[in-house]
Amino acid sequence: MCFFNGEAMQAAYEEKSMAREIHRIVHESPALTGALAGISIRSARTGELVYEHDAEIRMRPASNMKLLTAAAALEILGEDHVFQTELYIKGVQVANVLQGNVYLKGKGDPTLLEKDFDGLAKELKQQHITYVHGDLIGDDTWYDDEHYSPDIVRSDEQEYYGAAISALNAAPDEEYDTGTVLLEISPGKRTGKKAIVAMQPQTDYVKVINKAKTVPADGKKKIKVERDHDRNVMTITGTIPEHSVTTREYMAVVDPTGYALRVFEQSMKKQGIKVSGERKQGKTPAQAKRIATHESMTLPQLLVPFMKLSNNSHAEVLVKEMGKVLNGKGSWEDGLEIAESKLNLMGMDMESVMMRDGSGISQVNLISANELTNLLYVAQDKTWFPSYLNALPVAAVKDKMIGGTLGNRMEQTAAAGNVRAKTGTISATSTLSGYVTTKSGEGIIFSILLNNFVEDKGIRDIQDKIAVWLAEQENLLKSER
């Protein structure tokens, strides 16, 4: 193992331009002093390794783990896969009264919006039911009852990136951060007034305590939102200057099944449908009658917000869905076992990989840069590869659903609109792995895993400089042989 502490890199690479340039880039960055860097570069055409540095050393991948999850999901679930949400009734209907229960059964859809619940409520109304003399029951038994991935830390459970996973869930908008609400915080009418808070979806399932104040236009903007650990009570504190732009904060909810069920109950009320009984959770009986089904977008469409925006919840849903579809058990244990088996069959060495979740949020995940470039190489031969490639963020493209997490990186360079790669960030970890085409049209696969740095300033610049340099080259692969 080699640390970047000013020592020369491997002598075998010193005489080659790629090694010299990458050495220069990493050596010039004080942020990498005492840190680890795993770098792997391959020919996209042949898979030949043309450069590696500590590329066999296992490192934390952060959200580069999503590259494995997406590939396994496409291979196992297929491009036609959709998630269904089903509406059932059980009982006797007399005129417009249902003497019985309504069941909302979730099957993992992480993209359910308020408008989708509205659509299901309209389907219920079309049954000429306006009064339910019984209960409204949410069924999330498609998956197991473990809502958090194995290594998630307690403090992350309130954050959108650590939201609880459920087979029945709701998202606030078309970024599809399932299991969250969106709080939009704007300045009040004048200094001294409370900030104005709007919530999507608007629901009383979450209580908001607004302590944020409006300050003069030249004041400091400092808004903080915290949620009680085991209650859906969110407290907003801090200051927001007059005339400043709205602050948007996604916050995870406690009990996402109950959240989705409450949003659906509100949709029923919009349709004039009342429920006399309780709102609770349970299993849909076999004798219940299905009256409506909502289908999600297809898997390739879902991969766009998943990969572009690096949506952790989507990753964990896909893991559970793989377990459910192939093994009948919607659990992390089953899903990860199946994913690892399929990735092995694709040509990866999963014995060398520690895969603890689907998103990469775990600090225990481990993979080498060479194994990531190996995956990106073998994926090219799959029929689903165009969907996989399309889901990757594109450098310097502002449209969120194209550029994603690379939208503001490598602007006005040879990498702009060229580099397609997955980013990754957790504490002391920054990663970038994907594809780039050189100036002369050569396809390059790269993985840059940076671990154990103390300051993150300049870390992404290292990755960007390497990717840009690759994009600028002519006849790179020929010159490196």
Language-model regions, residue ranges each:
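Soluble non-cytosolic domains of exported or imported proteins
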Residues: 12-16, 20, 60-68, 77-78, ...
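Short beta-strand scaffold segments in enzyme catalytic cores
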Residues: 39-41, 85-87, 433
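Active-site SXXK
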Residues: 47, 61-79, 136, 168, ...
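Conserved serine DD-peptidase/penicillin-binding transpeptidase domain
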Residues: 26-27, 81-332, 337, 341-346, ...
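Beta-lactamase-like hydrolase cores
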Residues: 2-46, 51-58, 118-127
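N-terminal secretory targeting signals
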Residues: 1-29, 188-193, 199-202, 213, ...
